[in-house]
Structures are given as structure tokens and as C-alpha cells.
Amino acid sequence: MDTVTKKYIETVQVSDIPWHRLTTSYGRGTDFPNQFDVLWKMDSIEAVDVAGEDIALNIEHQSTFWHATPFAMIFLLRIFKKAQEESAQNEVAHYLAEQLVELFTVIAECIRDGLMLEHADPLPNFEDMLNEEYLWSEDYDEDEDVLRYRKKMYFLMIYSLASITTHCKCFY
């Protein structure tokens, strides 16, 4: 991983990512900041289950990654590290760490399987995926999103896999 990408991954904040403009399996990543917050707090297994399941369903579906996936992985890894540190004294943290290991295993298997596919060339920098040309519109318009999905999503799904494998070798 190059130093620019490493620094970006280490310093980017949830609020720096335009989640409402990133695709997921079922729409946009608008709810991700709140879901990351629930996971970070580790207050209850029930709350962690709901937030974690929603994130998992939206970053990977049928071995496909979405535009939000590589960015979500940054924050899930940070949450995992915190859960590991707190797992001895917090049963929710212990549970969350186990669940994240399962999710990371699924992600790693998708990466392994995806390496056999053809990929778009990766962008020079990880954060280039947030360039305006790759983002969905600021305003939600379901009809416009459907049209854009049909035209551009194949590239973004394949590019997200290429970015994860090129820039984020720390995830597997």
C-alpha cells in the first residue's frame, strides 16, 4: 500500500465520506454513519445486530462489492480493533468482534474469487473514488438512480474490487 493511501485510510473520518452519494446493494449509504456509531458504542447485542446486518447486506451481495464497500471497510476495521481491545470486559464488544471476523472472511473470499475476473484499471489514489464523476447525484431521485445504475454500476462494482485488492491489502 502506498503512503498516500495509508495516510488517507488512517486519517479519513466518517463525516469526510459522502455516504448519501455512494451506492450499496440496496440503494445509497446514507445510513452508514449512524450504523457505524451504533457499532462503535457497542451498547447492546440487539442494536449491534441490526446495524451490523444492514451494513453487511449493503456492502456485499452475491459476491459483489459496491461503491461504499471500500470506505465502509476502513471504519469496520477501526471498529473491529476497538471491539478486540474491549472484548475481555464487554460481552457486546466480544460478540461484535466475532461477527466482524465472519464478515471479513466473506469479504476476503469475495476478493479471492474476484481476482479471477477482469477489472478496470485502479485509479491512482484510493480517495479518487470520491471524485465527482463517480458519485451519485446530491439529491435522491429514484428514477435517475435507476438509469445511472444501469449505465455505470458495472464499472463501479468492478472498480471497487480492484481498489480493495490494490489499495487495501490490509483487509485480508
Language model features by range: what are they?
Residues V48-D49, T69, M73, N90-A93, ...:
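Residue-level detector of extended alpha-helical repeat arrays and alpha-solenoid scaffolds
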Residues H94, V101-F171:
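Acidic, serine/threonine- and proline-enriched intrinsically disordered linkers and terminal tails
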Residues M1-V48:
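N-terminal "cap/leader" segments of large eukaryotic alpha-helical scaffolds
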Residues F36-D43, I79-E91, F171-Y172:
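Helix-loop junctions that connect tandem helical modules in alpha-solenoid scaffolds
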Residues N58-Q62, I79, A83, V106-G114:
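Residue-level signature of the C-terminal ends
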Residues I45-L57, F104:
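HEAT-repeat alpha-solenoid elements in large eukaryotic scaffold proteins
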